């Protein structure tokens, strides 16, 4: 009787399984929907160049997503204390129709993480965020930026490219007249000028959630249209409860660069 070589059979089965894995595994385009947000690579990370937009959250909402702010009837604004604003949600940040390229706000930290994950991305850690925001890492940055230099603002040496309450660039937010007790609201993404590493609105416009826990909440970075430029600096450590959804808090997503 001929002796069966089980080792060869097992080895063949193993090779077949490996081949099947590589043929059938999903590519990034197959495994996650495509985001409309432009990206830039900084080190080993691929960053969304702008904050998450209403348009991309609409894509996530096709899964049946309804935000906590929607379920409660509206998100929050600060008016000497947090006040619920009926009808203010990620789709209608100031209670009226918004355009798809506005930053998505009124979303809590867990919702932000879920939206990033839907697009095959994640929220950045605080260390990742500050590195991308303040340390110029482009090989050949444009005039006004120097590779390896750490800047005081995400916009560079000054906050001039950013949108904030005062002392920043000459921008006006899209909030309807009389809707806010302070400031003019956010501007549409990519309508300011790029800053360190070619990123838009890392300083000002809206706060950005991170994945880093602190003081029982999660750190937010970059400040917003509600504050002056001093809150944009790296030394400003701010954390907020994970379940809070506010008119001036948004986020951006990041992905780990895949080496081919």
Name each model-derived stretch.
Residues 85-238:
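Functional-site microenvironments in short loops/helix caps that host divalent-cation chemistry
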């Amino acid at each position: 009787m001929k002796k069966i070589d089980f080792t060869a059979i097992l080895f063949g089965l193993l090779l077949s399984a490996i081949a099947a894995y590589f043929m059938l595994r999903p590519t990034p385009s197959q495994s996650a929907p495509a985001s409309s947000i432009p990206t830039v690579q900084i080190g080993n990370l691929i960053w969304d160049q702008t904050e998450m937009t209403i348009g991309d959250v609409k894509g996530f909402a096709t899964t049946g997503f309804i935000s906590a702010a929607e379920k409660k009837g509206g998100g929050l604004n600060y008016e000497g204390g947090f006040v619920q604003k009926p009808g203010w949600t990620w789709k209608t940040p100031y209670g009226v129709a918004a355009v798809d390229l506005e930053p998505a706000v009124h979303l809590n930290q867990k919702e932000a993480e879920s939206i990033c994950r839907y697009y095959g991305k994640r929220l950045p850690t605080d260390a990742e965020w500050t590195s991308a925001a303040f340390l110029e890492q482009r090989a050949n940055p444009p005039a006004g930026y120097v590779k390896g230099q750490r800047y005081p603002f995400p916009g560079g040496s000054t906050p001039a490219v950013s949108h904030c309450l005062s002392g920043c660039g000459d921008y006006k937010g899209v909030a309807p007249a009389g809707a806010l007790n302070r400031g003019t609201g956010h501007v549409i993404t990519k309508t300011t000028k790029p800053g360190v590493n070619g990123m838009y609105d890392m300083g000002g416009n809206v706060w950005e959630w991170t994945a880093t826990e602190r003081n029982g909440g999660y750190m937010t970075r970059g400040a917003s249209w509600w504050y002056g430029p001093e809150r944009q600096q790296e030394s400003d450590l701010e954390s907020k409860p994970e379940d809070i959804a506010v008119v001036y808090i948004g986020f951006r997503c990041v992905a780990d660069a895949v080496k081919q």
